Amino acid sequence: MKFFTKKSFAFLMVILMMFALVACGGEKKEETSATGTTNANGELVVGVTSFADTLEPTEQYFSWVITRYGVGENLVRFDENGELEPSLAEEWKVSDDKLTWEFKIRDGVKFSNGNPLTAEAVKSSLDRTFRKSKRADGFFKPTSIVADGQTLKISTEKPVAILPQCLADPLFLIIDTSDNVEEYTTNAPICTGPYVFKEFVPTEYAIVERNENYWGGKPGLAKVTFKCINDQSTRALSLKSGEIGVAYNLKIENKADFEGQDDINIQELKSLRSTYAFMNQHGALGDLALRQALLRALDKKAYTENLLGGAATPGKAPIPPTLDFGFDKLVDENAYNPESSKEILAKAGYKDVDGDGFVEKPDGSKLELNFVIYTSREELKVYAQAAQANLKDVGINVNLKTVSYETLLDMRDSRNFDLLIWNVLAANTGDPEKYLYENWDSSSASNQAGYKNEKVDELLDKLNVEFNPEKRKDLAIEIQQLIMNDAATVFFGYETTFLYSNKKVQNLKMFPMDYYWLTKDVTVTE
């Protein structure tokens, strides 16, 4: 048995700052950088979009907030290159029959309340996650989780090739369950990260403070405030004025807001994020011909190059071209072709009976598709409005419905949509397997669009147990081609992400898996 280690696999009462960036609490100063002297007790304000309405890590994707804000940690994590590395587990190995993974829990780690991190504590946390989360079984299903000293063993009925990578997803962050809290709301779970929650007001702000018990060295900031500013332009202006020091989810067009302002850093990364829309096959879009016609009406190249200024790659397949899973080999039978779209509609019996410019269904009833989008990402509205216009040109009537992210999740789960936009990491485990399973396996709790292809299910089962990288790649390519042939989903584009910050903020990094916003290394200078 070989051990795998590092690379194997609110508003606030006082938000406006008197200085160009952040409040500096305390007098102690340390290292000198190119931009000034590091403040050992510095404070930072970060502009974000509203995302979570509770701090319950098993609900929806709210664990991402806990991790992004520097509070939650996992057994393993991803580095800047998307490679797996140790975190709360120092090393891990798989048994010869590939049914049991063994993790050695790091010694000397404490939760923020001072309780020691033990294998038993990790087991209790993971047990809670599998008991409470609808998503957990989509990663893997343990037959047993056993703690022995500082060793944790996880067994499964079938081999799970990427089980360690699965445990890097924020859903599996480790909390201290000894507080016996069944459901966290604005009260925060006790974790091991460099920061702890001080205050959380949903849709307004969150405050985190330095974890004095942090095992990885002294965190670089005394306090960080995450301020919800959903409007993109307002977020940019807040950074420009110095009200905030970091702005997430700004776009390429915001560069113009900072022309001539040399105190701003702009980082960019071709991300693993994919923007797509589910097509609900429980309704009108259960008709393959209608889905094919819809896809062929969409000029996705124009959306990404003209409307988004080249800050995205046109969509075609489930997995972005930034991952080596056959993007260029895949054939898009439903590429942009509006004349073909009209022909498919006519042949399938969709005709404009009443002369209003929109086709009716073959039975003569009205065809109206409701397209649900959420508010916290500006580019989603751009895609949706452009798609609405393209579809009008071929006679398909689409109504846009803009809601909060939380409402969108409820509408997805209740199947209250025809089209529903989505923007996620296509490799949340560093590998696309779980992304493919979660969205297109017929048994997945997240597959509320009703897509079902028995061959896709079969290939996903094979992918789950296949350890050979080249065979995994071949399986993923075949799965993608089937999904595309079924006209299952609208793949709009794969974004380039941007991170805007004041130059006084040091050691702020972008990661392919965008789980890690606030790390212990982030500091501010005077």
Outline where the language-model segments fall.
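C-terminal motif of bacterial Sec signal peptides marking the signal peptidase cleavage site
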Residues: A20-A23
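Surface-exposed binding/hinge segments that line
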Residues: K93, D97, D137-S178, A293
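Ligand-site clamp/hinge motif
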Residues: N211-A256, N397-N399
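Gly/Pro-rich hinge or "lid" segments in bacterial periplasmic/extracellular proteins
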Residues: D79-E83, A168-P219, K223, D231-S233, ...
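Detector for C-terminal structural segments
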Residues: L298-D328, E379-Q388, R412-E526
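Aromatic- and charge-enriched surface segment that lines or borders ligand/interaction sites
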Residues: E90-K132, K153, L285
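N-terminal lobe/hinge region of extracytoplasmic solute-binding protein
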Residues: G47-V94, D127, I190-C191, M513
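Append "and occasionally in soluble cytosolic enzymes with long acidic Gly/Pro-rich linkers
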Residues: D287-A389
